[in-house]
Amino acid sequence: MTTLTEVLDYKVADLSLAEWGRKEIDVAEKEMPGLMATRRKYAGQYPLKGARIAGSLHMTIQTAVLIETLVELGAEVRWASCNIFSTQDHAAAAIAKSGVPVFAWKGETLEEYWWCTRQILEFEGGKGPNLIVDDGGDATLMIILGYKIENNPELLEKAPANLEEKALYQQFREVFAEDSQRWHKVAAEMKGVSEETTTGVHRLYQMMEKGELLFPAINVNDSVTKSKFDNLYGCRESLADGIKRATDVMVAGKVVVVLGYGDVGKGSARSMRAYGARVIVTEIDPICALQAAMEGYEVSTMDEAVKEGNIFVTTTGNKDVITLEHMKQMKDEAIVCNIGHFDNEIQVEQLYAYAGATRLNIKPQVDKYTFENGNCIYLLAEGRLVNLGCATGHPSFVMSNSFTNQTLAQIELWTKDYAVGVYRLPKELDEEVARLHLEQLGVKLTRLSDEQAAYIGVPLDGPYKPEHYRY
């Protein structure tokens, strides 16, 4: 157990992987023009000088390029992954060897995961971060919930709702025993958080509505150059990559059930259809359901689709969308996976506890569950992100969009004073992120004349669309 006065340099799987990681980071930099342009733009200016940034985001090669961008802009950075399976160990090793404290390895336990999250919130001299780069909201949650517990220590005695909560509360007990005001001190120095993903944004808005949010937040997820690119085009490529690396299955001719038709669901459905699958979509939202139908997908309920599907993909950000009863009804050899942020989209804990199923591990992140009737299913990445648990996540180019937004959000929070609330980056920055990625694709923009700009009522150099425009 570490104490608040013992600040560790790093904890990774194997530091000898650093050279391999560095080679891949060098390759990724060429595919991440937005981040590299941001480095050039602010060279010598250090807009993040003095900032202590805690990062809770998948420790991949692409994230390594983000980390080193933040460091070049002047920040002191500590990093952990936001998922127990998503770390690329050679990326973590390279970052650790560069001198950035990183606490991440592929295959963490829940106890280790929350220990790692705690480490990124503990800087030298007993200080906490003043900025967070978050993905899913766990680092933010640790501060907010820790603050709440310090106001009402009886919360430490409540029975945990699940294994995740049990592991988290163990960290809270250790911190509280050392310093009963630790999280109040951390919160007091916080300038803000930039949140990467849909699930984390939902958490932020819920905290705001309840009056629990303690510092400003920028919703990076809903920047157009994030949600319409990372969520859509990234998933379109990385979902199939994860499924195929895990199972070697032929997708063509299969029935794939995609649960949810938001941006992630849209990308996932397109991916599976492109491989020749017949895709069934489930939806709660009539607008998204109509979109799916107009794209030619069958739209049904899970209770009906469960009997037809060969592959099931959850994309909703909600819990219990695939239940234990659903899994018991699936066809023999069905594949079950998730590309939403948390594993509770699938009732994984209920499956673990079910005496009528036997588990056989096929290989890392691929488990076969056989039920009493002889049918089996394959659960990928224990219900966590299949594209990162079973493959390497989204390609570098699309992550450059997202991470350029993250970098700009960190600069925005550090250099300006925001009131507590949830904000989005301005439209002109969204357009700038897109512009930084055009040259690499050989794109040539048409330019308005003065008369044309005046005619449609937009500035000559943008922004070209109103805030309410839906791309």
UniProtKB/Swiss-Prot annotation:
Keywords: Cytoplasm, Hydrolase, NAD, One-carbon metabolism. SMART domains: AdoHcyase, AdoHcyase_NAD. InterPro entries: Adenosylhomocyst_ase-like_sf, Adenosylhomocysteinase-like, Ado_hCys_hydrolase_NAD-bd, NAD(P)-bd_dom_sf, S-Ado-L-homoCys_hydrolase_CS. Its main location: cytoplasm. Substrate binds at residues 60, 135, 196, 226, 230. NAD(+) binds at residues 197-199, 231, 260-265, 283, 318, 339-341, 387. Its EC number is 3.13.2.1. The keyword RNA-binding does not apply. It catalyses: S-adenosyl-L-homocysteine + H2O = L-homocysteine + adenosine. Pfam families: AdoHcyase, AdoHcyase_NAD. It is found in: Cytoplasm. Disulfide bonds: none annotated. One of its GO terms (biological process) is S-adenosylmethionine cycle. GO terms for cellular component: cytosol. Belongs to the adenosylhomocysteinase family. HAMAP family: AdoHcyase. May play a key role in the regulation of the intracellular concentration of adenosylhomocysteine. This is Adenosylhomocysteinase. It comes from Pelodictyon phaeoclathratiforme (strain DSM 5477 / BU-1). The gene is ahcY.
